[in-house]
């Protein structure tokens, strides 16, 4: 397998990733700003499929109409010249001080109206550029103090904002779907819709939830101490994995945004295994872009930025190679059988069986030997050892 990425791999990068200048809460920028046109050309040279952006990554918040027109003209020309796509667009409702208490859930109604208008205008741009997904990350939607929010009203306002945007997409006939991006905290002390599970529960309450799904991020779920592969699996199972953000994270701490696979490597392996191979017993598969949302080390110049971009794609392709070999290994297939993974794919009730039939089946309870069943060895360690051996290239 070649480690040279091609557009067929569908690797995408946020403009805010390779364009991150290194400024953080404790220090100023360590790199100059990156021209979006240069980012398009460089990512194309590296074999990427697409580039994504927040509205203000591309067009400054205070740009004039003529400045905006020129920026978009140059950006579109670069896309046309390189063939790079813009599969996803999102809106910045977190950087400007006006959003210090949120966008959709600010206690200031005028700010909420401004935020919603900003989102609707950005939806128009996303559709114009041929995007398929419109991500919403509510980084400022939350609080530090529980008494500062009517939590029911905040969720009502979040629902109102998302439903209004979704209805606008439908009214305009745009081929867009909305993907909510969960995160537990940072920059707010507590962010609304902190995990995949919260996101799924929220979507179930929406009027236009049919076009609203999720954009889980590796580090965001792991910041909450959760299993990222389990999270995306449930989103996929629910038909709501609309987009995915891949990066690296080491434990419960601030959002590290490392190169994919440079954090929890075993978790990264099983993430790629799920994305590429699907569930062992079949079921829905993810067919969207493999999007990298990371930060190049602020200790590097732009030579290091482009090396880190290549590293994300190389790590994914290496893990894909290992994951394909893992599933194709006869020993692994036998271990999956021994561990009961295939048996888990069998319905507990027989076809057409009722609860009355189950209760009448003596073998299911009265004659069931719990002590004997408890002696079964599932050999999960053996199965995991095989996975690690494939991950390390030992098989």
From Swiss-Prot:
Protein location: Cytoplasm
One GO-annotated biological process of the protein: D-xylose metabolic process
Cofactor note as given: Binds 2 magnesium ions per subunit.
A Pfam family matched in the record: AP_endonuc_2
Enzyme superclass (EC): isomerase
Catalytic activity: alpha-D-xylose = alpha-D-xylulofuranose
EC numbers: 5.3.1.5
Top-level taxon: Bacteria
Oligomer and partners: Homotetramer.
Protein family according to the UniProt entry: Belongs to the xylose isomerase family.
The protein, known as: Xylose isomerase
Annotated source species: Arthrobacter sp. (strain FB24)
């Amino acid at each position: 397998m070649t480690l040279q990425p091609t557009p067929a791999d569908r690797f995408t990068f946020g403009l805010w990733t390779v364009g991150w200048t290194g400024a953080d809460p404790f220090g100023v920028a360590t790199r100059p700003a990156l021209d979006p046109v240069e980012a398009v050309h460089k990512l194309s040279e590296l074999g990427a499929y697409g580039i994504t952006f927040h509205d203000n990554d591309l067009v400054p918040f205070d740009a004039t109409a003529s400045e905006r027109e020129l920026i978009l003209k140059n950006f579109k020309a670069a896309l046309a010249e390189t063939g790079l796509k813009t599969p996803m667009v999102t809106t910045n409702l977190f950087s400007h001080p006006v959003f210090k208490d949120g966008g959709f859930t600010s206690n200031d109604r005028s700010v909420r109206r401004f935020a919603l208008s900003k989102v609707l205008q950005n939806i128009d741009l996303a559709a114009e550029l041929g995007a398929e997904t419109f991500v919403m990350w509510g980084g400022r939607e939350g609080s530090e103090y529980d008494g500062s929010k009517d939590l029911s009203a905040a969720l009502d306002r979040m629902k109102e904002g998302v439903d209004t945007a979704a209805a606008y997409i439908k009214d305009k006939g745009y081929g867009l779907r909305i993907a909510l991006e969960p995160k537990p905290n940072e920059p707010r002390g507590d962010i609304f819709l902190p995990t995949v599970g919260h996101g799924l529960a929220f979507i179930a309450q929406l009027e236009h939830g049919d076009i609203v799904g999720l954009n889980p991020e590796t580090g965001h779920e792991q910041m909450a101490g959760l299993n990222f592969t389990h999270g995306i699996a449930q989103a996929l199972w629910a038909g709501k994995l609309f987009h995915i953000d891949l990066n690296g994270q080491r434990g419960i701490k601030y959002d590290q945004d490392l190169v994919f696979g440079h954090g929890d490597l075993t978790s990264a392996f099983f993430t790629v295994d799920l994305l590429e191979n699907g569930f062992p017993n079949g079921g829905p598969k993810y067919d969207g872009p493999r999007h990298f949302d990371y930060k190049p080390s602020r200790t590097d110049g732009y030579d290091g930025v482009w090396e880190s971009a290549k590293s994300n794609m190389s790590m994914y392709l290496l893990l894909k190679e290992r994951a394909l070999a893992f599933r194709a290994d006869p020993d692994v297939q036998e271990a999956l059988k021994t561990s009961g993974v295939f048996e888990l794919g069998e319905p507990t009730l027989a076809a057409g069986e009722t609860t009355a039939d189950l209760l009448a089946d003596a073998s299911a309870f009265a004659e069931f030997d719990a002590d004997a069943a408890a002696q079964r060895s599932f050999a999960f360690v053996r199965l995991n050892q095989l996975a690690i051996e494939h991950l390390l290239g030992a098989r």
